[in-house]
């Protein structure tokens, strides 16, 4: 679309990559945090698909290369899921969180409080893609047999249930 073409033709993509790489250096954690920030910022004005296309084209190979240089192996599918999930998070995070503000309008609640509550409930959606980067077994990469896959699925389900219960104050 128009945004993707504008980012590519104006040279913004190369400048943005250079700025992010110079800030992060070889630090993978800072690079991941800056990629999250970029996803959330672009998500304020772009639909999810366009956000994914722009950020994936800008940052996916940077994350893979810096991860490899730092001793981490980030599968390309994990990086793409990471970018996609944080593109989805832009819909619930203030100040633009369109889904949160629409819910507040329907319920008659305060938009900012609804946005903050939406972030709290979506924490698992924010943690999961980071786990994808560092634990490839969640994507069934490197799983050797059926029992190993079953163990990964069961422990993942238990973990997400406990995490969700904690954010819902069931403990």
Regions found by a protein language model. Give the residues of each.
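Alpha-helical transmembrane segments of multi-pass membrane transport proteins
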Residues: 1-171
